[in-house]
Amino acid sequence: MTTETFFRTFTADTTAGSANQVLARFPAPVTRTGRVSYRLTRGGERYALLFANRIDSTFADGAISKANDAGGLWEIRAMRIGLAKEPGMPAGACQTVTFDGRPNRMVQAGEGFFCSDPVTLRAAPGDCLVYEVTIRGNDFPYHEEMVLNVHSGEHEPLPLDKRIPVPLMVGCDRPARKKIGFLGDSITQGIGTPCESYAHWVAKAAEALPDDVSVWNLGIGFGRASDAATNGLWLARAKTCDIVTVCFGVNDILRGRTAEEVLCDLITIVMALHEAGTRVLLLTIPPFDMEHDHQAHWYAANDAIRSGMVPADRILNVAPILGRSQPFSHRASFGGHPNVEGSLHLGHVAARYLNQMLIE
């Protein structure tokens, strides 16, 4: 199946964050098996998985990998998916996942999007899709800060270890009236809420959206506006959506970018999405207990966003939801990475904005 067919036919069916966050770098090729479960949002009959072999955003200080870095040559030796009722439970009848009819696939260094063939599962809402893959290679992408339990290793029983490639989308061919993407950093991804709780703000927003709307969580820990603005595969995924929420700025400021630079990056992102026909709900930079120069840039950037300097379709001011009362609105009331309570508040407000955009 071509990626054009994939994006035309399949939409995301989990609110778990999805990204190529960092490169695993083993000194020599290894054969590893990995397993992870995804809670399905809407359910459906046919599923397909999306992958790529490039990094989405710079990890930490960039010493390990940076945005758009290419993974090396590696092989998918086997892949299976099945259904379970709860995360961590063994799947029922697992099915082999194929690529153009073949059960294995060589992934080229730096390869862009590629996808699996469809698999029939007939999942109900709330079921878990169990993904299992065996690969061989030494330089491949994985998601270090995934808010799911990932088991991987060279021998059973597999230990908790996230170094295994995971899908960028768990796609279902259930029809969707509109596709909504959530582009952002660890706050969007869901860090701050318990592992496998699906209590992050994107999940809470999804619960308040119509059943015929799909939600794709494009949040990634350490995510930066400056990286999304490079117009790589990360932003390319967002461009396939009808509406995208954009929430950046914390990591940019903490890594030394000025308010002016953050605003320029946000303008670049919004304009690129508009050129693709995607409408944008822009969130102000969330509170993160910044101090000194960082605090000054936080206030300056947010003042400019609220004034309309970034040409988004709608603006959602996050500070009154997650921050303390003025003059301390830069301080987080629910943790820099919002906890369950903070995520619930933000999710409900975001859903109100999105539901309004759906009828405009």
Where does each model-flagged region fall?
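N-terminal secretory targeting modules
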Residues: 1-183, 188-189, 193-195, 358-360
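Alpha/beta-hydrolase-fold catalytic nucleophile elbow
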Residues: 247, 283-284
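Conserved SGNH/GDSL esterase-like catalytic core that processes O-acyl groups on lipids
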Residues: 63, 154, 177-271, 289-300, ...
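Short, well-ordered coil/turn elements that cap or connect secondary structure elements
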Residues: 210, 275, 309-311
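Extracytoplasmic/cell-surface-exposed regions of Actinobacterial cell-envelope-associated
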Residues: 110-141, 146, 155-162, 209-217, ...
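A short helix->loop->beta-strand "cap" motif at the edges of active sites that frequently abuts
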Residues: 276-280
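Catalytic His-Asp segment of secreted/periplasmic serine-dependent ester chemistry enzymes
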Residues: 286-360
